[in-house]
Amino acid sequence: MGPGGRQSAEPASTEVFGDSDFVVVANRLPVDQERLPDGTIAWKRSPGGLVTALEPLLRRRRGAWVGWAGVVENDVDVQDEPIVQDELQLQPVRLSADDVAQYYEGFSNATLWPLYHDVIVRPIYHREWWDRYVDVNRRFAEATARAAARGGTVWVQDYQLQLVPKMLRAMRPDLTIGFFLHIPFPPVELFMQLPWRTEIIQGLLGADLVGFHLPGGAQNFLILSRRLVGADTSRGTVGVRSRFGEVILGSRTIRVGAFPISIDSGALDQTARDRNIRRRSREIRAELGNPRKILLGVDRLDYTKGIDVRLKAFSELLAEGRVKRDDTVLVQLATPSRERVESYQTLRNDIERQVGHINGEYAEVGHPVVHYLHRPVPRNELIAFFVASDVMLVTPLRDGMNLVAKEYVACRSDLGGALVLSEFTGAAAELRHAYLVNPHDLEGVNDGIEEALNQTEEAGRRRMRSMRRQVLAHDVDRWARSFLDALADSRPNDSADAAD
């Protein structure tokens, strides 16, 4: 145990070397384990922009992916052999039911997630959750140390694994280690609430390069490195994919940068042009009664996404007659998320109550004004909805980036449609020709939606053309290359301070 009864985040050193020159470490593997009726195990590929961007590099550099397979195991101390799936080497890390409850649902998603999203919901602080977070991070670090070749490169992903860089540095000081945070990094005064604030910052400082979506997150991290660890840091501003900050820790220099993540925009653009997608988009409009305007929301069912905000705005616009109920519909596609967490159960009940109230007030029999689906939607069906809709509503209270906004833009080769976008998304810094709104200002959201609905064709095409230029030029491949190029320039120094 560490000081004050805390579980120590210090791992034991290891001298075991693997054969993978490049290792990605993430909470989940890019495959899901399935048990077939005959009892055998099968692996199903999970779609995702990250694996799409990194797959060529993983193949070229004898790469491996370390992560959880998505199934609960009883014996977590068993070291599974690597799996080869579609020529990719995958190294599973086992999690028990208690691990999932305490490390994932607990510390990751009931402590860190709300804290990093501006405390929209109050974070819960439990020492038992922290201890389990330390333990699981150690297991990920150990699996990575076994997989990585001598002098290899490791890229650790996201908030669930913030202790892995320091642990891995202690085990394998020969490695080049990068870390990227896919969610917002909070303001200093909010982060300081965390009882284990110093341990998290120290964990991240085990990396050679720490990446965030936006310069603001990088600046917050530099301040916290000075305040909590006593490190010397650069004082200038951090730029996007340039002008890196630096943290000096012993004889090590850690670079800190901003790398806005993106999507496989070229592939989406091509798919959205497909004849079958276009036909399906017309069918969707017909199934909705051929309304004059379709508003669309696509989100995980999460309290950060502001689904309630757009429903309130739509209700007020209907009440004030600024939107006509006989020619405008709102479609909300809400993917189930973290259904065992109480705050998410409450959110679902609240959203469904709102939908029922709006339809009860404004719908006609057989013609609801809000169409709500609480289930996953197949990828091509989602693309057809993007093509069919007139206004995309993206109204999070806080979001690290929001890739749905970029996906919508990538699908609109016709230059149709409009994007209403929260100022509190990372995407707002890049999609400046969206209708930007403050989700905390309901009247402002109402005005933004009304303006988007009533834009002229010329203005809409001009806005969409500008946003598409940005999204198509800055795709997920460019994001990955920019991070990894910066990481290659951040080779670790050989020193006795490597694990400081």
Swiss-Prot record:
UniProt xrefs under InterPro entries: Glyco_trans_20
Swiss-Prot/TrEMBL keywords: Glycosyltransferase, Transferase
Biological processes annotated in GO: trehalose biosynthetic process
Enzyme Commission number(s): 2.4.1.15, 2.4.1.347
Keyword Hydrolase among record annotations: no
Pathways involved: Glycan biosynthesis; trehalose biosynthesis
Molecular-function annotations in GO: alpha,alpha-trehalose-phosphate synthase (GDP-forming) activity; alpha,alpha-trehalose-phosphate synthase (UDP-forming) activity; trehalose-phosphatase activity
Binding site for D-glucose 6-phosphate: R28, Y104, D158, R338
Primary enzyme class: transferase
Membrane-crossing segments per the record: none
Reactions the enzyme catalyzes: ADP-alpha-D-glucose + D-glucose 6-phosphate = alpha,alpha-trehalose 6-phosphate + ADP + H(+); CDP-alpha-D-glucose + D-glucose 6-phosphate = alpha,alpha-trehalose 6-phosphate + CDP + H(+); GDP-alpha-D-glucose + D-glucose 6-phosphate = alpha,alpha-trehalose 6-phosphate + GDP + H(+); TDP-alpha-D-glucose + D-glucose 6-phosphate = 5-methyl-UDP + alpha,alpha-trehalose 6-phosphate + H(+)
Gene Ontology, cellular component aspect: cytosol
Signal peptide: none
Sites annotated Involved in alpha anomer selectivity: W113, I183
CDD domains: GT20_TPS (cd03788)
Binding site for UDP-alpha-D-glucose: G48, G49, R300, K305, L403, V404, A405, K406, E407
Record has Ribonucleoprotein as a keyword: no
Database matches in PANTHER family: BCDNA.GH08860, TREHALOSE-6-PHOSPHATE SYNTHASE
SUBUNIT field: Homotetramer.
Family: Belongs to the glycosyltransferase 20 family.
Function: Probably involved in the osmoprotection via the biosynthesis of trehalose and in the production of glycogen and alpha-glucan via the TreS-Pep2 branch involved in the biosynthesis of maltose-1-phosphate (M1P). Catalyzes the transfer of glucose from UDP-glucose (UDP-Glc) to D-glucose 6-phosphate (Glc-6-P) to form trehalose-6-phosphate. Probably also able to use ADP-Glc, CDP-Glc, GDP-Glc and TDP-Glc as glucosyl donors.
Protein name as catalogued: Trehalose-6-phosphate synthase
Organism, scientific name: Mycobacterium ulcerans (strain Agy99)
